[in-house]
Amino acid sequence: MVTYGINGIGRIGKFALKALIEREAKVSWINDSSGTIDLHRHLLEYDSVHGKWDADFSNDEKSITINDKKIIFQTSSTIENIELEDVDIIIDCTGYYKSRSKLLNYFNMGVKKVVVSAPIEDENIANIVYGVNQDIYDSKKYDIVTAASCTTNCLAPIVKVIHENIGIKHGSI
């Protein structure tokens, strides 16, 4: 089974974690550089927009448990200072590591793939908008992929439909 880790438990990281837990994926590690473990457990359980996550939560000094799944929790502000073991895929939701060079330390710790929640301009990194260009993904070619940007994810599907059905000569955002 693939093991996931999430760096950055803000809005996007929190919902990535929730999606993985609800699909019974194995999440072994989360990190957020600000706040205490008690605060993050509370923020995972209660969301100001989406309400309470219907799950059982507890924590100790080093981990958060969600529905009997224990997840190591760290508060490191840099990749160089994290302690990472047995994680296959990292989902980086920090908004900070937006270049290949900044993400390389994950691979030095044994991570096989990195998914970044922010766009990265690099021809060796795939910026994917599901429903628009997910067919460009090649697991042998890309070890880092991004989910593009919020603006791109909102605009690209609409632009694709308009362009394919009516045509677009040029535009700007």
Indicate residue ranges for each PLM-predicted region.
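N-terminal Rossmann-like NAD(P) cofactor-binding subdomain of oxidoreductases
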Residues: 1-172
